[in-house]
Amino acid sequence: MSGGGKGKHVGGKGGSKIGERGQMSHSARAGLQFPVGRVRRFLKAKTQNNMRVGAKSAVYSAAVLEYLTAEVLELAGNAAKDLKVKRITPRHLQLAIRGDEELDTLIRATIAGGGVLPHINKQLLIRTKEKYPEEEEII
C-alpha cells in the first residue's frame, strides 16, 4: 500500500506547519481592496525613460483610489436611497458628484446618461401674494 497516486502528498519542504503563513498579496498586506500589483504595473508602464517605481507609491496610489471610490459610491448610494431605488445608476453618480463641491472640481468629466442637475432660476419662480402685498394694491 504505497502511495500510488490519488492521496495528498505530505512529505518534503512544502509540508503544512502551524506557524507558517501562506502567500499574501500586496493588497492584503496593506489592508486594501484595490489591487496594488495592478496599480504598480500601470505606474511602471506609464513612466517615461524607464524610471523606477517604489513599492510604497503603488500602495499609496491604490489607497487613494479606494478612498475616492468609496466616497463616490457612498454619496451615490445616498442619492439612490433618497429616490427609493436599490440600484445605483449613472444619474445617481451625477447627482452625487455634482452635489459635492470638492468632487465636482476633481471630476470634471461628462457622465454618460447622467442628465443635468435640476435648477430653476429665481426670476422664473411665481411670486406669492404674502411676500409682495404692495403689488396687490397696484392691481
Swiss-Prot record:
Protein keywords: Acetylation, Chromatin regulator, Chromosome, DNA-binding, Nucleosome core, Nucleus, Transcription, Transcription regulation
Ranges annotated as biased composition (Basic residues): 1-11
One Gene Ontology biological process: chromatin organization
Entry's localization field: Nucleus; Chromosome
A GO cellular component entry from the record: nucleosome
Region (Disordered): 1-27
Modification after translation: Acetylated at the N-terminus. N-terminal acetylation is essential for function.
GO molecular function: DNA binding; protein heterodimerization activity; structural constituent of chromatin
InterPro entries: Histone-fold, Histone_H2A, Histone_H2A/H2B/H3, Histone_H2A_C, Histone_H2A_CS
PROSITE patterns named among the record's database cross-references: HISTONE_H2A (PS00046)
Subunit structure: The nucleosome is a histone octamer containing two molecules each of H2A, H2B, H3 and H4 assembled in one H3-H4 heterotetramer and two H2A-H2B heterodimers. The octamer wraps approximately 147 bp of DNA. H2A or its variant H2A.Z forms a heterodimer with H2B. Component of the SWR1 and INO80 chromatin-remodeling complexes.
Function: Variant histone H2A which can replace H2A in some nucleosomes. Nucleosomes wrap and compact DNA into chromatin, limiting DNA accessibility to the cellular machineries which require DNA as a template. Histones thereby play a central role in transcription regulation, DNA repair, DNA replication and chromosomal stability. DNA accessibility is regulated via a complex set of post-translational modifications of histones, also called histone code, and nucleosome remodeling.
The family this protein is said to belong to: Belongs to the histone H2A family.
Protein name: Histone H2A.Z
Organism: Schizosaccharomyces pombe (strain 972 / ATCC 24843)
Name of the encoding gene: pht1
